Amino acid sequence: MMKLLLSIATAAVALSLSAGLAFGEDFEVRMLNQGKKGSMVFEPDYLQLQPGDTVKFIATHKSHNAATIDGMVPEGAKGFKGKINEEVEVTFDQQGFYGIKCSPHFGMGMVMLIKVGEGSLPEHYRSVALPARAKPRLDALFAEAEADQGKP
């Protein structure tokens, strides 16, 4: 009888652990006209995720969307483009860095960076053509990502 109870308990623990690995965490990013870091921002503007985590981009203010920046998506990963004024949920399965923009406000510097899993920022991200106001914001996010390198 004791062996049966031990087997059932072991199976229950194994099942609960495997179920926890199957589902990622959920995050929310607000798209704002005005935020803590100025006008036309994502909050937060930098996220560290694990593969399988999901981000819900919330159009808190009108005229925003979330879309990947050309040239700033990990090799083998698909980009995405949400519709204006609509929430979009994206599950990030591929490790690497994702540059994200608001299409209508890219020229105003509305960008964010998402890091999924481990790894270093690809050097070619620094040479991607960007609007003048987006470049300093992304450079600051690149520095933040590099400062987090190796942290859990």
Residue ranges: model-predicted function:
Residues 10-12, 22:
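Cleavable N-terminal signal peptides
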Residues 24-35, 108-152:
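Extracytoplasmic/periplasmic copper-protein system
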Residues 58-83:
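Histidine- and aromatic-enriched segments that form or immediately flank copper-ligand environments
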Residues 97-99:
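Short, conserved beta-strand segments of beta-strand-rich sandwich/propeller modules, principally
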